[in-house]
Amino acid sequence: QLRCSPRRISRLMKELDIHSVTVNKWKAASASKTKVEQRPNLLKQDFPTTGLNQKWTADMTYIQTKRNGWCYLSTIMDLHSRRIIGYSFSKKMATDLVLKTLESAVKNRTITGDLIIHTDLGSQYTSDDYNQRLTELHIRHSYSRKGCPYDNAPMEAFHASLKKECVYPVPVFEDYETAAAVLFEYVHAFYNRKRIHSSLGYQTPLQVEIAT
């Protein structure tokens, strides 16, 4: 085991003309400075279901591009099949983005019973417009506890797969249009139709839905 004092390290770095590199930690921008109080967590990490359209989960993730900077992918997942049923991609992180995702999910499904949608406490999801639309659709809104990603673990797992299998290999998309095309292909052609899940008995989301 080698021992070396900070002073010696500093001296050697100067002699060899070596400079340390400081990387600024990237911090996600918030669309609102308003402090959000805790809201009801109806799901409480109870992810299992007995059928479709009982529990949905929604979230956004950041996608970097060279020409357009950060872009935003918004999705909704049905927890029964783990299928992405709502999808929207935008250059702006706004309430319109998550509303568009919600409308795409509703268009793809027939809601007949009690349905919960679970999100974080982001300003887009706590907005009056979003919650008014949920009320109109008779969908109950559940929220993660602040700073607790485990409350939305299935969506966190989806984002991890997306980044590992689709985003990081690039490593940075040229522009918004390129990212949009690649992400759409990954979600709709691969993730929903071909990617097997151990939690689904090594079936794809589409196979589960067909069998339901």
Show which residues each predicted segment covers:
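Basic, flexible linker segments flanking DNA-binding modules
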Residues: Q1-G51, C148, T204-T212
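An active-site-proximal beta-strand-loop segment
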Residues: T49-I85, K91-K92
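Short small-residue beta-strand/loop micro-motif enriched in glycine and branched aliphatics
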Residues: S81-Y87, H141-Y143, Y168-V170
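Conserved, non-catalytic sequence blocks in retroelement Pol enzymes and Pol-derived host proteins
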Residues: Q1-L2, P48-T49, K66-R67, L121, ...
